[in-house]
Amino acid sequence: MTVSTCATQLPVVTSTLLENAPVAKGIWKLRLGSAEIASNFVPGQFVMLRIADRTDPLIGRALAIYSADAKVGTQRSWIELVYQVKGRMTTQLAELVSGQRLELWGPLGNAFSDKVVEHLVMVAGGIGQTPFLT
């Protein structure tokens, strides 16, 4: 008998770009309409992202969820992702405008523990600090 601990299928969610704006030199924030992901997100998780209808780059990129607002029962739920413009994919992301479509799968990854501890040390640098801001 085998026990599977992995999902057999991870649905892809097509999301609409609501906002794409620079927040610092070379750092951008995406706001995407996504009720499915916003309502299931737990701080510390990420999504895989691809630009819809493009095959270059073929492989999606992992981006930490910066913020989310799940407005239950409405179409106004969103998630925010922060990224650094560094390569081909992020350069293409920075050129996107509101209304364009992206493909997401997630939320993925282990969320932060909510266990109360006496001492906690968290270390992050650069764009890697995004999940700590949620």
Task: Say what each PLM segment does.
Residues 88-134:
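FNR/FR-type flavoprotein reductase catalytic core
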